[in-house]
């Protein structure tokens, strides 16, 4: 009888341990480097042309609360027929997903930032791959205590704002697939 009670008690302890600790023991999420961002998730973005120096144009893009960054940048590139651009930005994110490139898997390990953060730096470029504009961004996000996480930007939802300075160049830059790394990389000599 005492042994049966001990076995039942041990099962309950194991079960409760699995519930308590198993919630955080989920499988690591990975994403393919060539996965395009979803569009339609940035309805509040405002755009203004602030410089038109010949064929090079500079725009300011202001994101509203709730707008998703990669979606808004992709939509801008499509609407304005961007063939080559570079950008910088600062602002705030409510939450974000960044990626760290795992060479052994040839994929991005997803790092979730589930708390409000200062976007202390966002830089990137836009180039053409298979006829479509591809946004490539890297971001630094600072937590309340000043700790900074950075990596490849997968998604970031803005609150209260993001201020992007976007320079669009007239010469098309093209990307091609690097099969060794499973990445689409800019090739300045590639003409399409």
Q: Where in the sequence are the language-model features?
A:
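Bacterial N-terminal signal peptides
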Residues: 11-22
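Bacterial N-terminal signal peptides that target proteins for export
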Residues: 2-13
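N-terminal intrinsically disordered, cationic/polar leader segments
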Residues: 28-60, 64-67, 71-78, 84-88, ...
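Sec/Tat signal peptide C-region and signal peptidase I cleavage site
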Residues: 23-27
């Amino acid at each position: 009888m005492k042994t049966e009670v001990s076995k039942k008690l041990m099962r309950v302890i194991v079960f409760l341990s699995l519930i308590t600790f198993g919630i955080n023991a989920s499988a690591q999420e990975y994403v393919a480097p060539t996965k395009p961002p979803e569009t339609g998730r940035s309805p509040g973005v405002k755009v203004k042309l602030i410089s038109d120096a010949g064929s090079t144009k500079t725009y300011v893009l202001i994101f509203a609360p709730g707008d998703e960054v990669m979606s808004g940048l992709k939509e801008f590139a499509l609407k304005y027929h961007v063939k080559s651009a570079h950008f910088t930005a600062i602002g705030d994110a409510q939450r974000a997903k960044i990626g760290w490139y795992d060479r052994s898997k040839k994929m991005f390990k997803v790092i979730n930032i589930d708390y409000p953060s200062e976007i202390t730096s966002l830089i990137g470029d836009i180039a053409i791959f298979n006829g479509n504009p591809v946004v490539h961004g890297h971001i630094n996000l600072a937590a309340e205590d000043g700790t900074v996480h950075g990596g490849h930007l997968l998604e970031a939802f803005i609150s209260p704002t993001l201020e992007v300075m976007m320079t669009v160049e007239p010469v098309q830059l093209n990307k091609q697939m690097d099969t060794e790394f499973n990445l689409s990389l800019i090739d300045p000599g590639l003409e399409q």
